[in-house]
Amino acid sequence: QFPVFDEIEMVSRRNEIDILVTKRDVITVHYEGLQALEEAKRSFSRPSVLKEAFRSQMHLTYFILKKLIEFSQRQLDHIDEKVEAVAKKLFKNHEKEVLREISYLKRDLSEYRIIVRSQEHFIKSLLEAGVKFWGTESRVYLHDVLGDYIKLANQLEDYREAVSDFEDTNNQLMNIKTIEVAKTFTILSFMTFPFVLLAAIFSMNTRDTPLVSEAHGFWIILAIMVSGMLGM
């Protein structure tokens, strides 16, 4: 299984390829077009590549696996670009936009990780069986493939940690803004409470309420409230 980025859904999807190796042939089976395999075929147009790849079934298998992992590596490029874009938007008052982009990134990283993790078991199994099938000469080639996979897995983990750190930072920035807004509303509530209370008192329909029955009672009460606001 190898990841291919879906630009419409903004997530990595899996492409599957089966490789059957016999003493004489290397057979690949896939159910849809695989760009990595097409690139491998086109590279055979160079005589030096063709000669090296077709030295034996082991060399051809090694060549195909290298191309597939190189393709998986390139599929990380869009993730690298998005991680860089998110990093640049931090601390620039784009918390909602950053949160949305991080959500897409986390989904893409999770799908990518699920797909490529199956490669580890396959490569390790091939390393064990390949030495028995092709001989000890194949060990160095298969270890090279495993090394490429480990490099890919480590880079993927670095991106996951970076995105997690960005998410924590963005959440802290959003919390700070929420606290500031809550503080502002608390101050406003405290400042307006005396006037709300004053208005409630003078709105009571009682005979002894002061100023209400005066000729200019409304304006007197309004002047008191405005003076109080200006005094604050």
What are these regions (language model features)?
Residues 126-139, 163-175:
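Long amphipathic alpha-helical coiled-coil segments
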Residues 1-135, 141-144, 148-158, 211-213, ...:
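Peripheral, non-transmembrane regulatory/ligand-interaction domains of membrane transport proteins
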Residues 147-232:
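Hydrophobic alpha-helical transmembrane segments and their immediately adjacent juxtamembrane loops
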